[in-house]
A protein has these predicted regions:
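N-terminal pre-catalytic "stem/leader" segment of glycosyltransferase-like enzymes
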Residues: 1-53, 68
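Catalytic core of nucleotide-activated saccharide and alditol-phosphate transferases
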Residues: 36-124
Length: 124
């Protein structure tokens, strides 16, 4: 199945052709980034999303900002809230390397003890 999607109003370094949405969706769908999308994924860094009316709008935010469901059909965000099937909580840290998080680095106790580190905790 082919999905036509577009990304607008993301941070300046966001790559619309190589990102976590493309990585996830391309496992099941044939993805085409298009100026005439069926699905628009947008964020908080602009107002270009207001120019799109004939597509499904999905709001994505990694910050603690509550989605306005008058402006979007679905939302993916940080807030701990429920809005039926229209909202999915996806904290920003989930997008980090899962393998690296699942297999923490093993720390050698000898290395920790022999690093000549000193710390003070002061309270008045």
């Amino acid at each position: 199945m082919k999905l036509k999607i577009n990304f607008v109003d993301f941070w300046p370094s966001f790559d619309s052709r190589c990102n976590f949405f493309i990585d996830i969706l391309s496992k099941k769908y044939d993805i085409e980034v298009s100026d005439d999308p069926d699905y628009l994924i947008y964020s908080i860094f602009g107002y270009e999303n207001l120019q799109y009316d004939s597509c499904v709008k999905i709001f994505y935010v990694g910050e603690n900002i509550t989605p306005d469901f008058n402006l979007c059909d679905y939302a993916i965000g940080f807030d701990l809230m429920e809005f039926g099937d229209r909202y999915m909580r996806l904290p920003y840290y989930v997008l980090y390397d899962i393998e690296k998080l699942a297999t923490p680095e093993i720390i050698d106790p000898e290395t920790v003890l022999n690093r000549k580190f000193c710390s003070f905790v002061v309270s008045n």
